[in-house]
Amino acid sequence: MSTPRNPLLAGHWFTNELALIVAIGCVVLFTLAVDSNRAYYNRRDESVQEISRQVAMLGIFALGAAVVIISGGIDLSLGSTIATCGVACAAIVLALTPQSYAPSMWQSTGICIAAIGGSIVTGLMIGTLHTWLITSIKLPPFVATLATLVGLRSLARAFCDYVNVKVTGTGGSKININNPIFVFIRDNVWVSVVVLIAMVLVTWFVLSKTVLGRHIYALGGNEQAARLSGIRTENVKWAAYCFSSFTASIAAIFYLANSSVADPVTQARGHELNAIAAAVVGGCALQGGIGTVPGTLLGVIFLRVVVDGVSKMIKSQAETYEGLIVGAVVVAAVTLTQAKQLLSSGRQMFAGFRGSAAILALTLFSGLVALVTLGHWNALIISIVILIVLSGIKLSERQPSRV
């Protein structure tokens, strides 16, 4: 059996982590220099709390995404799983909360514990469903989780309407909750941060110090070789996908607490891509077998710092550009990780007519992004610089290498 590509165990993770730390520092310094409102200075505590909240919420289920990617799979349903688990959690709160009087703190605590348990059980059931579709029905992970990405939200919406009719007598696609424990979770950011730290430590320990962790890396590195070596790959996949859905069920609790409403239509929509992006930026290879927990955590921090920095620099409708930012960061991260392989193999990035067309497309696309964010003069300058740089790369590729 080939040796599992586990950079954490091999001790080759430092460079990637160091690069991310430097990148995070550069983004923060650039934001400090460019932001005219000086938000990091004038509203320091508020900025730290908001970034911490967003990092904790994304980081919790990004760990699940990373474990699945390391095992050689993919989970596209994390956002829908969060929404579904949030609905299950809110439905239990609504069903158990007395309508005729305000429950005591002890009653509210018991209701909250039951609701959290319901969210976790729902997540584990979804993870088990994914494993069955992948191992028994033999669906590719992409297809299996894409199906639940779409189907779970519709199911959660229908369940919302059913619960509202049964409990309140009126239908609705949202479930509003009023529980003091969830209010406490919302108002105390440290709760989500502590949960994230605990999950980071547990995930790191499992991946780096246990047999299951070695099997996850082996499965992602070469599934056929792992199976021939005696590893029960179906069980390892079940552990990976259940852990992914478990992290989503934990994240759902904080999503629900932050908004006090379970909304399966919009809650965590598209956030599964943010989790995958954070894992990839943190060093996880989409082909499997490579990835670290520290890298994933730093990928989450980097992604959220970049998004927050853009929101500070672009004063209006900054959320419009979040998807663009995430996509650009992922492409840049994957390109940088593949750069060494491209150089060593002698392959050309911009070969022939297709390369010239790609240079033109990249220049126009970059100019368009700069136009809508920075203005027409900056867009013109950026377009010219990118055109010159990419054309220089193409010309250098055409030069014969000297031995």
Predicted regions located by residue number:
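Membrane-interfacial amphipathic/re-entrant helices at transmembrane-helix boundaries
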Residues: 2-60, 97-114, 371-402
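Membrane-interface helix caps of multi-pass small-molecule transporters
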Residues: 67, 91, 96, 124-137, ...
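Transmembrane alpha-helical segments in multi-pass inner-membrane proteins
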Residues: 127, 242, 248, 259, ...
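Transmembrane helix-bundle core of multi-pass membrane transporters
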Residues: 141-209, 238, 259-268, 313-322, ...
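Helix-loop-helix "hairpin" substructures at the membrane interface of multi-pass membrane proteins
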Residues: 111-119, 125-126, 130, 186-261, ...
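Single transmembrane alpha-helix segments in multi-pass membrane proteins
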Residues: 30-34, 44-101, 132-139, 225, ...
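Hydrophobic core segments of alpha-helical transmembrane domains in multi-pass membrane transport
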Residues: 19-33, 65, 120-123, 149, ...
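Alpha-helical transmembrane segments within multi-pass membrane transporters and channels
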Residues: 99-149, 298-303
